[in-house]
UniProtKB/Swiss-Prot annotation:
GO terms for cellular component: cytosol; endoplasmic reticulum; endoplasmic reticulum membrane; nucleus; ubiquitin ligase complex. It is found in: Endoplasmic reticulum membrane. It comes from the Eukaryota. The active site is at residue 94. GO terms for molecular function: ATP binding; ubiquitin conjugating enzyme activity; ubiquitin protein ligase binding. Belongs to the ubiquitin-conjugating enzyme family. CDD domains: UBCc_UBE2J (cd23799). The keyword Oxidoreductase does not apply. Catalyzes the covalent attachment of ubiquitin to other proteins. Seems to function in the selective degradation of misfolded membrane proteins from the endoplasmic reticulum (ERAD). In cooperation with the GATOR2 complex, catalyzes 'Lys-6'-linked ubiquitination of NPRL2. It comes from Homo sapiens. This is Ubiquitin-conjugating enzyme E2 J2.
Amino acid sequence: MSSTSSKRAPTTATQRLKQDYLRIKKDPVPYICAEPLPSNILEWHYVVRGPEMTPYEGGYYHGKLIFPREFPFKPPSIYMITPNGRFKCNTRLCLSITDFHPDTWNPAWSVSTILTGLLSFMVEKGPTLGSIETSDFTKRQLAVQSLAFNLKDKVFCELFPEVVEEIKQKQKAQDELSSRPQTLPLPDVVPDGETHLVQNGIQLLNGHAPGAVPNLAGLQQANRHHGLLGGALANLFVIVGFAAFAYTVKYVLRSIAQE
């Protein structure tokens, strides 16, 4: 923060915002970082990292706080710059911690308090002036798109170089993941009805490798064994049947002779 910022803002506002800046550096707000413009301490920019288990997860949301010269006795105005699906972009937001409600403002509230209140309202679904209604799917899409969007913002890149590097690393990881070849076997049905699978670099035909020819000799031997066994059983049945028939004829002839 340069000395020019002190000349533009009243002493009370400057001193208070400097204290808040030191406090927020010592005790950061969860999911949020903030920096004042080097040329104007009355304009702060912030970045919200989308919290886990919310539609904003993975997103980066850039916005700004405009403090009045009467701060901390009057509240700031809050704007969201990055498309997010919750608030309109570049529009004053109507929250209890903004200049829309000076009657509810508490001069003891710090920049950390303001940013915490903003995040709390962001993850809720209550309507207010400056809010919009979108599906969770849309919010997740905007979360993904927020990375590239913010990198195009000059002020964002100048004030938050660490976040910029974080975003670039995340984009690199996403690109590497999307460029990886498909490892799952994918069926490829050819006109003759055969199904080809590619697994571990080997094309399988109907579940077998091309060189995996069935053991014909083994199959023939098994078939021959089954044929011999079936023939032996058939002969056995014929012999038993003939013996039973001969015994029956002999019994009948003996009965006739006795009569």
